[in-house]
Regions:
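Bacterial N-terminal signal peptides
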Residues: 1-6
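Second-shell loop/turn segments in exported
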Residues: 33-37
Length: 142
């Protein structure tokens, strides 16, 4: 007699929308939910946001902005806030209003750190600028 039991943990409604970021510069993504599974691909981008779509013990199944999926050990994930700009030429403003001074433009796909969010705006930073971008133009953890 075989009895199959599922160890998979069901995501609650908050986790379904949860994002985390990559803790290290290099992170292995596996085909399954243990170190026994082969590496599917490797991320080489610290702070890259990933969406959590499933959980199995100490592994989380993630999906990135380009819809790539795989499993990452929890030790390689962080709660640091970061996002990807999803609109070409988003404007970074000095204050959270379109009537504020424009500081720069963000190209689509640009990774930014998120300092805080206020209503429809997020204060972000990259290597060159710190300012406010509309939240609707960001994908990730904030």
């Amino acid at each position: 007699i075989f009895v199959l039991t599922g160890h998979q943990l069901k995501l609650n409604s908050q986790e379904e929308k949860k994002f985390l970021t990559l803790k290290s510069e290099i992170v292995n993504v596996r085909q399954g939910h243990s170190f026994d599974y082969p590496i599917k691909f490797i991320y080489r981008k610290k702070n890259l946001p990933v969406k959590i779509i499933d959980v199995w013990e100490n592994f989380k199944k993630i999906q990135d902005y380009d819809n790539n999926q795989g499993w990452i050990h929890v030790s390689k994930l962080s709660k640091r806030k970061a996002a990807i700009n999803i609109k070409n030429n988003s404007i970074i403003f000095k204050k959270p209003t379109i009537f504020s001074k424009p500081l720069a433009r963000l190209e689509k796909g640009r990774l930014v750190l998120v300092k805080k969010c206020k209503n429809l705006w997020c204060k972000i930073s990259d290597e060159n600028y710190t300012g406010w971008v509309k939240k609707e133009f960001l994908w990730g953890k904030f």
